[in-house]
Amino acid sequence: MEKQVKNYGRSIREKLLNITRDSGQRYQYMYLLARYFNERLLYRVSVSQYKDNFVLKGGSLLYALDGLDTRPTVDVDFLAEKISRDREYLEGVFREILSIPCEKDGVTFDIAHITSEPITVEKKYPGTRFHITALMDTIVHNMSIDIGFGDVITPCPESVDFPMLIQDNPSINLQAYSIETVIAEKFHTMIDR
């Protein structure tokens, strides 16, 4: 008979601590927490009606391609496609996405206190950064989501299975930048700066 979990958040916290211990402290606990919260945000995007409107890019994509050995990323980056650029509209979209329940992951998001600000205002298509708070058991974690617009993906977005820290959780499949676009964007950033 399977043991009934009463507090998924506490159980996940213990599992993440075990991963830290089992790695010989190679993975710092706070980095694993940040990755876990990013992962569970991505899960909600992947099962939402907006999953085809947000294409994963940036550090979270590099993590998906390379696994645990990449540097930790504190935000999640998306290219938005076929969706309004209006900040208030996007805020409503993310309230809807972040309210998708997933009891087994132990995470909830404070959808009442999402804030946003414009980013990359010097570009032809300015983006938006959302600041959100994730909660798990007694842990409160602040994170951000950067949304960009107008980039070209060559040849086209690819389907990516996002690696899971805790295998018991529902899996994540997202649209993501192609590796060619990742490399081109990195070169463009180096030249632009």
Q: Where do the PLM segments sit?
A:
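Compositionally biased terminal segments of proteins
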Residues: 1-193
